[in-house]
């Protein structure tokens, strides 16, 4: 798999290794075993570290992110991957559909996150309309996301028919996350937001994932698939790490839209979302308190003014 390196073991024996001297002195102690891989010890997360995490049985986390300050917060929290997703269409720009956002709108968001993140890997979505026409279009769009936006990798919604797109990106030196299962950019073709991989469809998702991994994707993201399908895919792609969103806990990593998992948005959230906080309520209460203190003259007080 492209972007993954294989380290030669330091313990390989050599035919020229010195033999112990025939003396009464004690033989030197054998070299200690190599230290187990620890993702938390990695100073800058790269594709190889995610593969090592899967091999070591360690899970990693990904959150969406769209600005520098939030990137800094998530970086301090140890989140390994930040996804500048086309979900920005909904949660940042106020569009009804992710299909609306353009590449030109995505790039400034990617650049902001890249400036804020120091440890996490920044992955940028290829938005609808920026890659479908040809592998060449995909490469041109991805180059902009990396060159102008500072992304470390791109995510592409694809199936087995798009292996040449992935190969073209990888040949250009662009790490690829392949998105299979439910692909939001194809919501109309899929008949809406529906769980994928039920029954015989499970094999199709597996075939898509394997084909894209073999084409060079360093990671496979599965969205809204059954637990059985997620396990099937995770096993089938071997050493390639997997990320799930609504794909059970069998994957190597998990991803959520941060506004959903922190309770920033009102209304129903998808079944696969767990809300770890209610930031929206905190912000609303703070804004209301500010407004009331401005009206009453309590703010600004003496300690907030200059003589």
Which residues are covered by each model-predicted region?
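Alpha/beta enzyme core
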Residues: 5-56, 60-307
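Short, Lys/Arg-enriched N-terminal segments with co-localized hydrophobic residues
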Residues: 1-3
């Amino acid at each position: 798999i492209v972007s993954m390196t294989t380290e030669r073991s330091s313990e390989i024996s050599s035919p020229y290794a010195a033999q112990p001297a025939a003396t009464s002195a004690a033989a030197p102690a054998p070299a200690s075993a190599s230290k187990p891989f620890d993702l938390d010890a990695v100073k800058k997360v790269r594709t190889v570290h995610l593969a090592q995490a899967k091999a070591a049985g360690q899970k990693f986390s990904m959150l969406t992110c769209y600005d520098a300050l939030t990137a800094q917060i998530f970086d301090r929290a140890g989140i390994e991957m930040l996804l500048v997703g086309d979900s920005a269409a909904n949660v940042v720009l106020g569009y009804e559909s992710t299909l609306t956002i353009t590449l030109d709108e995505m790039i400034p968001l990617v650049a902001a996150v890249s400036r804020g993140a120091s440890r996490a890997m920044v992955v940028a979505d290829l938005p609808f309309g920026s890659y479908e026409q040809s592998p060449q279009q995909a490469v041109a769009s991805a180059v902009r996301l990396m060159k102008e936006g500072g992304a470390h990798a791109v995510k592409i919604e694809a199936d087995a028919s798009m292996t040449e797109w992935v190969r073209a990106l990888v040949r250009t030196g662009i790490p690829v996350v392949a998105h299979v299962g439910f692909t939001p950019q194809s919501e109309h073709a899929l008949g809406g937001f529906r769980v994928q991989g039920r029954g015989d469809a499970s094999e199709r998702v597996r075939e898509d994932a394997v084909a894209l991994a073999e084409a060079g994707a360093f990671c496979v993201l599965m969205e809204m698939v059954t637990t059985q399908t997620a396990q099937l895919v995770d096993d089938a792609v071997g050493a390639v790490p997997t990320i799930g969103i609504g794909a059970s806990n069998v994957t190597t990593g998990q991803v959520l839209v941060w506004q959903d998992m922190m309770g920033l948005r009102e209304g129903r959230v998808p079944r696969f979302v767990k809300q770890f906080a209610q930031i929206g309520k905190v912000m609303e209460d703070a804004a209301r308190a500010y407004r009331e203190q401005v009206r009453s003259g309590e703010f600004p007080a003496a300690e907030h003014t200059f003589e």
